[in-house]
Amino acid sequence: KRPVPVTSNLVEIPDELLEVQKDVILSMDGMTVNSLKFLTTISHELFYRTAQYVPTNVASEYEKCMDELMAVYQQGQFQVTEIHCDNEFHKLMDSYSTQHDPPITVNYASAQEHVPRAERNNRTIKERVRATYHRLPYEHLPRILVKYLVMESAKKLNFFPNRHGVSKHYSPRMILHQENLDYDRHCKYALGEYVQAHDEPSPSNTNAARSLDCIYLRPTASAQGGHELLHLQTNQD
């Protein structure tokens, strides 16, 4: 089979739009779906949303999520300068914010209060999760499918321009990644869809199956256009 040619989907964002938004303010919160924990964020002007899976409720896992988040913004040449969050993140953010130069300013909500923008972000993501869940033909979902359902629900909210955002023409994803969507890579298959993956066992002169029964999870970030799948036989992605 011939390899898929790598094509560029880069899009040029006006410099005046990027320069004004270089310093990013985030609202951050935790969210639980079917006992799975996620760290959710939304940027105040770009309206770029994220939902990162947190395997265990320990500081090192949250710091890993924060490092991944900072890398996403830095790759787009943005810098997170301020974070709004609840008091539950006080211990984590006090140590994490000072690791950056200049330090990240952290604004904590008052006692018994929450960050309104972060709460609305959680509510919006959960609405998308419920809508997708009721579209699926399954009565029960494995934990790994729930994990990807939440992460993809947040990611797809970045596909379209936000009416309260900085641009009516450029989506949060386009502004941050400076890349257009590609139908074959990003939209051809839906989460939860039954697919068959091609396998090339080694050695190849056996009666082993050449296709694997899978449930579609999401596209990969590679330029070649790969996909992440849930293998039904092993329940592994």
What spans do the regions from the language model cover?
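Active-site proximal helix-loop segment of RNase H-like, two-metal nucleases, encompassing DDE(D)
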Residues: 100-105, 109, 120-142, 156-160, ...
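Soluble non-cytosolic domains of exported or imported proteins
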Residues: 60, 144-151
